[in-house]
């Protein structure tokens, strides 16, 4: 019975695909640049040419006549040169008057250089209220981008990593990061090749600040408990991020980007991927060096304490010494890549959140995370059994009071996350209350249906009719997005469609490009109506819209207790945006235009990048002042810094204030 139904579904998909292709062709023919606007622009450009060609001719004849005439008869020759100054100025004024008369609706401040189709509504009609449709369409495209990335693009990348047998760290830093940052990448491509503006730069810079400040602040505010951060993942990612930002600032000094500068940024990303490949050995080397120095310092301090205190006090004083001794080892046991958050198994898709879970901030189960990460460990256990056994034996000797058992795969995710829940935080041994809470939560999770929740993450996209009224309303709201995607792209989470992962990969790219084009186009129309530039739209609205899926996923992960994963993923996605999302369009533009440089001049973008660097420093200082804890104070501080950045960036772009660091 299922065979004819499947054939009908295949036929429907083929018919739908042909219908979409035909509609796109008709749309292209209808909205192609016609001859009438070309003639109008030609006549408009001919009029000022005629004026300028006649007036200099009159000036020349008057001057030649004055020279041939007798100076004794006409002394008014000295009066004629006086009107020559306003005559030359009148040429510019007549041109401006002709331009203003030909374009009465456009503002002189905002000039459009993009290649967009003609809108159904004029500027005056949009200012009368029809711009609401563009705003709604832009918000709707945000949801569409999130669905196509989470439901199709990221699972296809997961299949590619399985086929290529790439490790989890490298896959997370490359493919999964590309899946999370695909909208920013295509926005940058559209900004360089279609809109001819800096909307892509503004979107990436704004998205970077949004990920660092707003996402971290939201995770700190909505986390169930105070999250303790470790310094190794944050130090590793922020070090690369600072170097990349400094390179970008240096390249922006001359307001152009050469092809070799784009290659340097791509090389920086390749260095980051290489570091993630050897993350385990690098972490162990840093761990050994720090443990040697800390052991020497702690031995000296222990001897000093024994000399000054009595035997009873010395017994009490050994506990903080041992606690200090545990601090570097436990802090260094959890360094992982930033891209585990972009894993298709860890990401809760927008469609699942809106249909199956109406409260996206609801608590997720700790047991689910352990099961998912244990599956990753099983794949990596065979290849990593011989690595890291000696350093971890030393760790067990140093952390003798710790009850955590470390598996030989030191870089595997389950050992990292189990230590996160069981190991002491900030050098303090785990309390009995924490252990009781963990055991109680595990027992509660064991009683639930964990298998069904694990299957939901890998469950293919379903078009079944929901039961409740609210879910049915959301289903109807998302149906115009979900049905075309379901009809044209195979879902690789379905075992029968897993072999078509290449079609899913390229089909997702086409849909992401189409949705990104609609987003940039409608953002341009909204900005033209309101009177703001595309750079400001990218810094504010587009940056927040493209980062909302990562925001929701980061908050869910933070509420699970994975503060390191939430913070490190935010920084890791920014590294991909700056070192891939920006230089790839620039390099392609240089290649297609004879290796000519790309102009990136803007009123406030350079200063916005400098502000991004300063905000990153403020984040590091704030986390250090909060003693590496994600508490409410840190969340409020991050929100305040984000709104300060937005206000200063908009004022710089509108030239309300001048950039003090511009050259």
Swiss-Prot record:
Keywords for the protein's UniProt record, in alphabetical order: Antiport, Calcium, Calcium transport, Cell membrane, Glycoprotein, Ion transport, Membrane, Phosphoprotein, Potassium, Potassium transport, Repeat, Sensory transduction, Signal, Sodium, Sodium transport, Symport, Transmembrane, Transmembrane helix, Transport, Vision
Q: Which residues carry this modification: Phosphoserine?
A: 337
Q: Where is this region: Disordered?
A: 308-343, 384-465
Glycosylated residue positions: 59, 66, 100
Q: Where is the composition biased (Acidic residues)?
A: 434-461
Q: Which Gene Ontology terms of cellular component type are present?
A: neuronal cell body; plasma membrane
Which molecular function terms from Gene Ontology are attached? calcium channel activity; calcium, potassium:sodium antiporter activity; symporter activity
Q: Which family does it belong to?
A: Belongs to the Ca(2+):cation antiporter (CaCA) (TC 2.A.19) family. SLC24A subfamily.
Q: What name does UniProt use for this protein?
A: Sodium/potassium/calcium exchanger 1
| Originating species | Gallus gallus
């Amino acid at each position: 019975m299922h065979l004819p139904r499947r054939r009908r579904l295949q036929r429907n998909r083929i018919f739908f695909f042909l219908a979409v292709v035909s509609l796109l062709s008709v749309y292209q023919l209808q909205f192609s640049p016609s001859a009438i606007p070309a003639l109008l622009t030609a006549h408009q450009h001919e009029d000022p040419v005629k004026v300028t060609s006649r007036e200099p001719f009159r000036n020349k004849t008057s001057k030649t006549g004055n020279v041939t005439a007798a100076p004794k008869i006409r002394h008014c020759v000295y009066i004629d040169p006086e009107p020559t100054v306003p005559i030359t100025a009148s040429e510019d004024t007549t041109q401006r008057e002709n331009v203003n008369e030909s374009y009465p609706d456009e503002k002189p401040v905002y000039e459009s250089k993009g290649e967009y189709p003609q809108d159904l509504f004029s500027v005056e009609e949009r200012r009368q209220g029809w711009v609401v449709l563009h705003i709604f369409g832009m918000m709707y495209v945000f949801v569409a981008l999130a669905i196509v990335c989470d439901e199709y693009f990221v699972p296809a990348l997961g299949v590619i990593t399985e086929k290529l047998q790439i490790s989890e760290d490298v896959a997370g830093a490359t493919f999964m990061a590309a899946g999370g940052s695909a909208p920013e990448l295509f926005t940058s491509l559209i900004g360089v090749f279609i809109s001819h503006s800096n909307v892509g730069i503004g979107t990436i810079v704004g998205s970077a600040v949004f990920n660092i400040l707003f996402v971290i602040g939201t995770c700190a505010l909505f986390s169930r408990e105070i999250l303790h951060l470790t310094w190794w993942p944050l130090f590793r990612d922020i070090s690369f991020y600072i170097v990349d930002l400094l390179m970008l600032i240096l390249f922006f000094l001359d307001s152009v980007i050469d092809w070799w500068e784009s290659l340097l940024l791509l090389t920086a990303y390749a260095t980051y991927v290489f570091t993630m490949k050897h993350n385990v050995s690098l972490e162990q080397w840093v761990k050994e060096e720090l443990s040697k120095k800390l052991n020497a310092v702690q031995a000296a301090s222990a001897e000093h304490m024994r000399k000054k205190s009595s035997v009873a006090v010395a017994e009490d004083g050994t506990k903080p010494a041992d606690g200090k001794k545990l601090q570097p080892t436990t802090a260094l046991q959890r360094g992982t890549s930033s891209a585990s958050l972009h894993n298709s198994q860890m990401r809760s898709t927008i469609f699942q959140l809106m249909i199956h879970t109406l409260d996206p901030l609801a608590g997720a189960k700790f047991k689910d995370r352990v099961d998912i990460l244990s599956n990753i460990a099983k794949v990596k256990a065979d290849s990593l059994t011989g690595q890291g056994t000696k350093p971890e034996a030393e760790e067990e000797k140093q952390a003798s009071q710790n009850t955590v058992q470390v598996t030989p795969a030191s870089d595997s995710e389950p050992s990292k996350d189990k230590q996160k829940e069981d190991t002491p935080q900030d050098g303090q041994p785990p309390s009995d209350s924490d252990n009781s809470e963990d055991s109680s939560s595990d027992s509660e999770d064991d009683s639930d249906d964990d298998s069904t929740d694990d299957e939901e993450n890998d469950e293919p996209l379903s078009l079944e009719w929901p039961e409740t009224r609210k879910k049915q309303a959301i289903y109807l709201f998302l149906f115009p997005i979900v049905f075309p995607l379901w009809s044209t792209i195979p879902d690789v989470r379905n075992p029968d469609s897993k072999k078509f992962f290449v079609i899913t990969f390229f089909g997702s790219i086409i849909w992401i490009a189409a949705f990104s084009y609609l987003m940039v186009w409608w953002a341009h129309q909204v900005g033209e109506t309101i009177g703001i530039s595309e750079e400001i739209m990218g810094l504010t609205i587009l940056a927040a819209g493209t980062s909302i899926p990562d925001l929701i996923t980061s908050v869910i992960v933070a509420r699970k207790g994975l503060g390191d994963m939430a913070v490190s993923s935010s920084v890791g996605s920014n590294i991909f945006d700056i070192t891939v999302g920006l230089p790839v369009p620039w390099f392609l533009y240089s290649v297609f235009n004879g290796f000519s440089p790309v102009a990136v001049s803007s009123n406030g973008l350079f200063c916005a990048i400098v502000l991004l660097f300063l905000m990153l420093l403020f984040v590091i200082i704030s986390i250090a002042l909060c003693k590496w804890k994600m508490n409410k104070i840190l969340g409020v501080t991050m929100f305040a810094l984000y709104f300060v950045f937005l206000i200063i960036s908009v004022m710089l772009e509108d030239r309300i204030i001048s950039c003090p660091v511009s050259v």
